[in-house]
């Protein structure tokens, strides 16, 4: 998860640093879900 990091040590904002994205969230699970925009992971095979 090297593309996810805190903007600074004085706040709780998590920033996506994938390319030029820079999407910011306050919860780790939100940024983890956001990363799926960049990684086309399909957990289930379509029929």
Swiss-Prot record:
It comes from the Eukaryota. Signal peptide: none annotated. It is found in: Nucleus. Its main location: nucleus. GO terms for biological process: positive regulation of transcription by RNA polymerase II. Keywords: Activator, DNA-binding, Metal-binding, Nucleus, Repeat, Repressor, Transcription, Transcription regulation, Zinc, Zinc-finger. GO terms for molecular function: DNA binding; zinc ion binding. GO terms for cellular component: nucleus. A zinc finger (C2H2-type) spans 14-38. Belongs to the pacC/RIM101 family. Transcription factor that mediates regulation of both acid- and alkaline-expressed genes in response to ambient pH. At alkaline ambient pH, activates transcription of alkaline-expressed genes (including pacC itself) and represses transcription of acid-expressed genes. This is pH-response transcription factor pacC/RIM101. It comes from Penicillium expansum (Blue mold rot fungus). The lineage of its organism: Eukaryota, Fungi, Dikarya, Ascomycota, Pezizomycotina.
